[in-house]
Amino acid sequence: MGRLISVSFGLLVVFLSLSGTGADQDCLPGWSSHEGHCYKVFNLDKTWEDAEKFCTEQANSGHLVSIDSKKEANFVAELVSQNIKETRRTDFVWIGLRAEDKRQHCSSEWSDGSSINYQNWIEAESKKCLGLEKQTRYRKWVNLNCGQPYRFTCEI
């Protein structure tokens, strides 16, 4: 009886260690998991508005990516670098931040409604939408014309 309990306990430990946290299982096929969120780079050229709309159609809580820490910024940069297909339009990738008023100031939140807790600007210009720039290995944010079509990353 003692041996059966020992074997059962051993199998339980193995099962739990193999199952992990389950974070990867929560993501849709083709999406990448990072700290409880799922991300996917789309090799489609869309304006900022159309990219945001596309992301919201992927899942209930989908939006253009919001970057809340240097760790997340590095994860997103690597994901974009590994998944972007090279074309003329790959110099920039949309993120979920844009100016919301006529003075071109950024809103106080990302397109998903979360607060801006981390910033990594290259420069301030008079354009309204923000993206990641290839020249910085997709690690810096740059102001872009919202009507230009670029690739994008969604987060759910």
From Swiss-Prot:
Name assigned to this protein: Snaclec A2
Note: Shows greater sequence similarity to the alpha than beta subunits compared to other heterodimer snaclecs.
Disulfide bond residue pairs: 27-38, 55-154, 129-146
Annotated source species: Macrovipera lebetinus
Quaternary structure (record): Heterodimer; disulfide-linked.
Keyword Disulfide bond: yes
Gene Ontology molecular-function annotations: toxin activity
SUPFAM superfamilies the UniProt entry points to: C-type lectin-like
Every C-type lectin domain range: 34-155
A Pfam family it matches: Lectin_C
Family: Belongs to the snaclec family.
Gene3D superfamilies from the UniProt entry: Mannose-Binding Protein A, subunit A (3.10.100.10)
Signal sequence range: 1-23
KW Cell membrane (keyword) present: no
Keywords recorded for this protein, A-Z: Disulfide bond, Hemostasis impairing toxin, Secreted, Signal, Toxin
